[in-house]
Amino acid sequence: MTLQLPCKIVQTLIKCGEHGLIFLKMKLDDMVWTKNELVDIISTEIVKVHANIFKCRLEDIEIIYVNTFLS
């Protein structure tokens, strides 16, 4: 896990029991300054994009890797 805070770009590799490995890249409008903010954003994105679209159960999702950038 490589965290550069503050950041505006977040890359996350997640593993879902049904769909295997999935790469999520988020370009944020606002800066993320803390790890707590980062966790909230990643959690929200996983629920919004992966759980709701692919109908994967949250219990089956595992975060493998997180990388953040400023620009």
Curated annotation (Swiss-Prot):
Keyword Cell inner membrane: no
Localization terms from the record: Host cytoplasm
UniProt keywords, alphabetically: Host cytoplasm, Viral RNA replication
Signal sequence residues: none
Main localization (coarse): host cell
A cellular-component GO term for this protein: host cell cytoplasm
Complexes and interactors: Interacts with host MAVS; this interaction inhibits signaling pathway leading to interferon production.
The protein's role, per its UniProt record: Mediates the regulatory switch from transcription to RNA replication. Acts late in infection by inhibiting viral transcription and up-regulating RNA replication. Plays a major role in antagonizing the type I IFN-mediated antiviral response. Interacts with host MAVS and prevents the interaction with its upstream partner RIGI in the signaling pathway leading to interferon production.
Family membership: Belongs to the metapneumovirus M2-2 protein family.
Protein name: Protein M2-2
Naturally occurring in which organism (per UniProt): Avian metapneumovirus (isolate Canada goose/Minnesota/15a/2001)
Gene name for this UniProt entry: M2-2
